[in-house]
Amino acid sequence: MADNIYVVGHKSPDTDSVTSAITYANLKNQLGMKDVVPAAAGEINNETKYVLEYFKIAPPVVLNDATDKKVILVDHNEVGQAVDNIMKADILEIIDHHKIGDIQTGKPIFFHNEPVGATGTIIASMYELNGVAISKEMAGLMMAAILSDTVLFKSPTCTDKDKATVEKLSKICGEDPQKFGMEMLKAKSDIKSKTAKDILFGDFKKFDFSGVKAGVGQIEVMDLADLAPKREEILAEMRKALESEKLDMIVLMLTDVIKEASDLLFVGTAAAKEGFEKAFGGKVTNNSIYKEKVLSRKKQVIPPLESAFKK
């Protein structure tokens, strides 16, 4: 319907992005706004499919073009990460936990941004604030969002509020967070059927570092050895994407969630390489720099890159 209000997350949707759209649309519905519907800005990943199937929730509609649509943005606030033609949409609200980006609106809107580990944490608190009871299914989705985005609380983005929220939500949905989180990780780590392109673009975001156009992707696995056979294919795909996406550099975080480390694959211009090496205090060897204790793109990869390229 033309009058629908779409709650939508970022492109290359992850579990927090998709479940936040569903749970926030549900909250709006409970508050009497029946024209609010959840949407996804692309195909959902294996982990999210697992979560939705587990809690018997239908996947949201896919929204590819925001022209003339009424939208509420969740889990992002940057044009490069949003549905196409987002600046031709009527943006009504933004709920997010990332740095303030470049999306602009023609009027004041409700903008809720908090330094927590997941948008799901914010939305759970909004149910409470509005006195709306959380169903077992919605509790499960929000718990999954937090576990996914904080990598089972291991990420430096994780806060006490995230942990306390999961504790509350787990009681409502009746699931053990650690057990459920490990099942989610298994679903996310299953890369057998994934192509190099799937791996690169499965969780891919674009950034502008003082004029340096960059793409930063991430794939989380339980063992980096699983990715070794596809490494050259992935690098070839990254080089191809440099041209097709008109970027100066691409970084792909190959993250081992068990060892809590990331192999940062790099392709890009000589100037971008210099900035990348400066950001991570090392030399690129075989197209990568390996970093212990690096799990979070938001907190451990983007800030050093921004700083390195700052003019």
UniProtKB/Swiss-Prot annotation:
Pfam families xrefs: DHH, DHHA2
Catalytic activity: diphosphate + H2O = 2 phosphate + H(+)
An example Gene Ontology molecular-function term: inorganic diphosphate phosphatase activity
Record InterPro entries: DDH_dom, DHH_sf, DHHA2, DHHA2_dom_sf
Obligatory cofactor(s): Mn(2+)
Residues binding Mn(2+) 1, per UniProt: H10, D14, D75
SMART domains in the record: DHHA2
Keywords recorded for this protein, A-Z: Hydrolase, Manganese, Metal-binding
Co-factor binding comment: Binds 2 manganese ions per subunit.
Binding site for Mn(2+) 2: D16, D75, H97, D149
Keyword Hydrolase assigned: yes
Enzyme class of the recorded protein, top EC level: hydrolase
Gene Ontology CC entries for this record: cytoplasm
This enzyme's EC code(s): 3.6.1.1
Similarity comment: family membership: Belongs to the PPase class C family.
Subunit description: Homodimer.
Protein's name in the database: Manganese-dependent inorganic pyrophosphatase
UniProt organism field: Methanothrix thermoacetophila (strain DSM 6194 / JCM 14653 / NBRC 101360 / PT)
